[in-house]
Each structure stands twice: as C-alpha cells, then as structure tokens.
Swiss-Prot record:
Basic residues bias locations: 1-10
GO molecular function: small ribosomal subunit rRNA binding; structural constituent of ribosome
Protein name (record): Small ribosomal subunit protein uS15
Quaternary structure annotation from Swiss-Prot or TrEMBL: Part of the 30S ribosomal subunit.
Organism: Methanoculleus marisnigri (strain ATCC 35101 / DSM 1498 / JR1)
Region (Disordered): 1-24
GO annotations of cellular component type: cytosolic small ribosomal subunit
Family: Belongs to the universal ribosomal protein uS15 family.
Keywords for this protein: Ribonucleoprotein, Ribosomal protein
HAMAP family, sorted: Ribosomal_uS15_A
Gene behind the chain: rps15
Gene Ontology BP annotations: translation
SMART domains: Ribosomal_S13_N (SM01386), Ribosomal_S15 (SM01387)
Amino acid sequence: MARMYARRRGTSSSVRPYRKEAPEWSNTDATEIEKIVVDLRKDGMSTSQIGLVLRDRYAVPDVKLATGKRIGEILREKGLESEIPEDLRNLMEKALGIRKHLAENNKDVHNKRQLQIAESKVRRLVKYYVRSGRMPKGWTYKPETAEILLTR
C-alpha cells in the first residue's frame, strides 16, 4: 500500500525486539525511573527526549517494560502532561516554519504544497485527539493562534 503524501510504498526498517520483560542488564527500579522521568520533564524535556535520555544515560531500553507504564502515563499521573500532544506540537511548529518561509518567498510553490500537507496532517491529528478526549471538544487548528499556543 502506498503512502498518503508520497508516490512510494512503505520501506522496511529495523524493528524493536519483542520482549515481555526487561533485559537483566537494564535498570528496573520503577520508583527511581519515575522520579527521573519527572525530573527530566521539569527540566523542560519532551516525552521523546526523556526516552532517549533514559536509554542512553540510565540503561532503560523500554520504560513500559521496566515500570509497567508509558512515559506519558507517568506524566499524566503526576500532573505534568503537556496540554498539546508532542506529535501535534511538532507538526504545528513545522507548519508555522513553512508559513514564515512563504511570507518572505511567496512564489515558492513546492513549499506551498508542503504547507498544505503539514496542515492536513495537523487537522487529521486534531480530529483524532478531540474524538479520543485528549483535546477539548470544538478545538480547531488556526495558524494565527497556533504560534501563541506554542510559545506557552
């Protein structure tokens, strides 16, 4: 099956090994890992950055195997979850960057298309998050207000 925004098929890539329990060499102290996650979040890191730091510095290859909870669940329990999900935030930042570029280079037709694609992805994600209850009902993406939301 082809990709949605490209004329190519999906490519094979590496797959994480299937495990039901954490490897014996990994750090498996759940309370310590949760404390580290909270500290890293308070330092301003996103969930993906927290996962990378845990993997590289603290020998935790998979937080869910070590603690039984995902990083987002740990942050939600502690009240540190961001109001905009990380994947949506990243796409909104990308769309705003393209908009700024097009304000100076308004004849750049290739990036006009990239803006359409990025904003389509944003709208699709917003629909999903509103439907699943992660974002409030009636929330819509508006480029004018997105920059204000991202600076908070």
